[in-house]
Amino acid sequence: MSMDNNDDHESKLSILMDMFPAISKSKLQVHLLENNNDLDLTIGLLLKENDDKSTVDNELHQLYDMFPQLDCSVIKDQFVINEKSVESTISDLLNYETLQKLKDNQANSPDSVKRNEKKNNWESTNDHIESIIKFTDAPKNIAQEYLAENGFDTVKAIIKIILDYYDKRDFKKDVDTFKVKRSPNTTVRGGRVQSSTGLAHVLKKGKESANVAQESLKRPRSYKHSLDSPQMVELNELVADNRDLKAINHEFLQKCLQFYDGDVVKVLNISSLLIEDDKNITKTWNFDEGFTLTSRDNCKQHLPKFSTPQISRRNEVGNTYKLPLHDKETPEGAVPVINNLFQTYRLDFHGFLPSEAVSTLKLALNKWWSKEVAERELNSHNINSYGSKVQFVSPLIVVTGRGIHSIGGISKVRLQVKSFLEKNHYIFWEESSYFRIEGKKKK
């Protein structure tokens, strides 16, 4: 290289060093020589390389923000494996996060580990997800999200989906599951705005895809729920005749009927799942609604398992679908109802004779009000300072129904229950098929 050429090379190298101070002199020199000492070409290539690196860094930082619970090295490795495709990386990381939660859950549950020793973790997770989809028709991402959030308890995830969506017209779109902490068009670390290949672009694409598939996420909503609807009447008749169904919270069954758009068969299918799963007979579910789903107190003996027959038409349910029948007599007494009182705060007198209903009501109210008084004594020297309505226990719901045998169209059970409440100075308000008892007046 001549003296003049050397001076020219050094001059161009000096310009590059001023423009790219983060790159070492030796690397800049290599770039310049590789491009035949063409300064403009070298600058253009270095700018593109720097821009690509900044874009990758920005996308990685956003992935770090989206999955703060995952190690950065895991995210970076997955990003490289997916050839720096943000969309593919998000999908894989969601699955990775689910698997990690499953492993954590199994680590805390030795029995669960033993049950799954012969089964691949991924297969086990997919089985759970498929079961949730079968009973809810939820999109896969919703099923996956609820499974992880509910400790990989399939039945609990199904129940929570029903409670969250029974009155909604559609499932939330896939894009909602990407918990991005900043809006797509904001400036990210390093002060750069994202390129068309960045995360915002991917999320926009995901939103467009969700809009295209929106019709498939819509849930059928032709059924208008009321206590007098033919479907509700039919379900009540099935419940009244069967102790297994009585073990399931009636309010939850109503929500199931709404979730399944009035399809009684599907309500019976989910009821079958609850009764078949032994652990759910003894488990108390306390979600935001605050009621108990199932309780062994309502089923004095271990319930047998059964399978649900396939029925093609809903209106055949009453004639062809029968759950295992323990007896069609009135309940065995007040004990199961009383034992479960402070879990459900509900008395259901379907199938009770008027005298049995009043006798059970008397025992329940004595226990209910005694607990309120005891709590008042523990919390204050003046128990009367709290007034006449309950402060420490929940109001009591007493379901009487409309009644097959009635006087002037009013249930005999209802008439006697109301008479008892009035005579004993209870504070209540009434609806067409139940009473809500809120306290007790001084005599």
From Swiss-Prot:
Organism from which the protein derives: Saccharomyces cerevisiae (strain ATCC 204508 / S288c) (Baker's yeast)
Residue ranges constituting the CUE domain according to the UniProt record: 8-51, 55-98
Chain's role: mRNA endonuclease involved in the No-Go Decay (NGD) pathway, which catalyzes mRNA cleavage and degradation in response to ribosome collisions. Acts downstream of the ribosome collision sensor HEL2. Specifically recognizes and binds RPS7/eS7 polyubiquitinated by MOT2/NOT4 and HEL2, promoting CUE2 recruitment to stalled ribosomes, where it mediates mRNA cleavage upstream of the colliding ribosome.
Protein name: Endonuclease CUE2
Annotated keywords: Repeat, Ubl conjugation pathway
Domain of life of the source: Eukaryota
Entry remark concerning the domains of this protein: The CUE domains specifically bind RPS7/eS7 polyubiquitinated by MOT2/NOT4 and HEL2.
Cysteine disulfide partners in this protein: none
